[in-house]
Curated annotation (Swiss-Prot):
Organism this protein belongs to: Aquifex aeolicus (strain VF5)
Record keywords, A-Z: Glycolysis, Isomerase
Pathway: Carbohydrate degradation; glycolysis; pyruvate from D-glyceraldehyde 3-phosphate: step 3/5
Catalytic activity: (2R)-2-phosphoglycerate = (2R)-3-phosphoglycerate
PANTHER family for this protein: COFACTOR-INDEPENDENT PHOSPHOGLYCERATE MUTASE, METALLOENZYME DOMAIN-CONTAINING PROTEIN
Protein name: Probable 2,3-bisphosphoglycerate-independent phosphoglycerate mutase
Gene: apgM
Amino acid sequence: MDVISELVKKNGSKILLIVLDGLGGLPVKEGKTELELAKTPNLDKLVKNSATGLHIPVDWGITPGSGPGHLGLFGYDPIKYQIGRGILEALGLGIDVKDTDIAVRGNYATVEYRNGKPIVVDRRAGRIPTEENKRITAKLQEAIKEIDGVQVIIKPGMEHRLAIVFRFPEKLSPGSDAINDTDPQQVGKEPLEPKGENPNAEKVAEVVRKFIQRATEILRNEPKANYILLRGFSQKPDIPTMEERFGVKPCCIAVYPMYKGLASLVGMDVIEFEGSTIQDEIDTLKKVWNEYDYFFVHIKKTDSYGEDGNYEGKVSVIEDFDAHLPQFLELKPDVLAITGDHSTPSILKGHSWHPVPLLIHSPYVLGGTSERFTERECLKGELGIIPAVKITQLLLANALRLKKYGA
């Protein structure tokens, strides 16, 4: 057990962590970042009585994926606990992943056959509607239920995405997921053949190759989604739950499968709800407020607009969140943290290595250091620049959930 686990105590306090995905940015207009351009009167008021700083999701100069970015926020070292995308996607779609499983994320894609070989012309099949995805996936699942004694579980995600789990009869050895992606990462190329990097992985890859062959036959006459590209083969990692480590009863309120999956992996209850807006998330939060003591709320669109290079869209999401902030505050959490899992500057159109703004509000902070919740103002804050993995213990401390260390 680590030191924090030994110091944890329960006291009924409530911790609310709100993650605006890809929150951090760089100057995009008039020398200002998206946070600086946004009109955020409610955040501006809150920040004056909060501890502020920035966090490094993984390590200096390292650009994190969403998985490592969130793991750090939850208090898990993302270098120690490495979780594959396939596992996250499968968990997020409600598949109860076991230690006999290899999970992989799939993209429906469009290929053209040239000289008998499939050539990728659209890696996302024109982002087919989710309903179309459900139809195609149901057809696939009906036709492919097992391969050589290995159960095949296929679940549709949003738009072109899906998850596939290969469930073997026995527990798999570590490293059985060491299989290359089949996505060539660009159009005009032939999909890659999945191959194992060791004998155990090659046994799995043999099943995967047969799956691709059968799926391709079934999809051949689909107008757009006539192929599947596979990414992120992964096994279930051995990871302690948040309740075991931190003594909290946690839940997750998120729209996108991967974030639900990650939360599930660390033992959070995933709260299902209709809709996808911030208001829908708040309504759900209110319903379960008395049932849990740690709440993770995920807001995706800041990241989506950042990746599109649409700084105005990102600004609008920040402003929309600010307009809803009073409803979060009405719940009176003992500790409120607002941050991102990583930075997604619009000018880079992708994740980046830059530190992420962090706000912690509780009765036990110095406060009075920042005028606004922005990158530059957070640099002035009492928290400084800290590793993301330390945030959870700060939240526990502010919730008075940690005993004194030593005599």
